[in-house]
Amino acid sequence: METLIYAGQARGCQRITSPSICSVVKRRALQFFLFAEIALFLPAAHLRAELSSGATYSLSFVDMDGNKVSTADGRVTLLVLVAAADREKARAVGDRVPDYCLGNPDYRMITIIHFTGKPTAIGRKLITALAKRRVNEEAKRLQTRYDAKKITRDARTDIFTVIDFDGSASSQLNEPAQSASFRVLVFARDGKLLAQWNDVPSAEQLAEVLTQSH
């Protein structure tokens, strides 16, 4: 209704003797239509409120092996949020972790695989089985780094992967349910957020933050 009024007022400007009144009416009509146009794109816009660096967060997750992990349990946490299609990015982050973090109980990497769809119960089982197989493959790759550094530890026990079907994990990062964003965050032992990126950080960037956290 307000749109029709503005439109009618705008057309009637030619019959208004005061140029200032006509200008105001046109400006209000333009503002209204611009607002309506922007509103159409808001659902697809980047609406999440990112976590604040320097703030403390106690975020809790359960990985695919049933391990309960937290960002404030006394370990430095490198957390990666990734969509299933971007798992190579998660691998790239892992490959850039400094060697002194490998097998070190003071450090931990958690990967959250976020699914935007709603798979069926059977679909979840298949996805979980596939994810476990890929995690085991990644463990073999990581084991080669352990062996090269003479770290006598099973690399598989140091891989923590959370399969987020319902958005309960990603929502703790203020991530919208249908978002497929990629994020990397580093938390100190007490859960203080030290750094965050929306792309794969360089090895130098990771090393700098992880060194400061120690």
Please tell me what each predicted stretch does.
Residues 58-76:
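A short beta-strand-turn-helix
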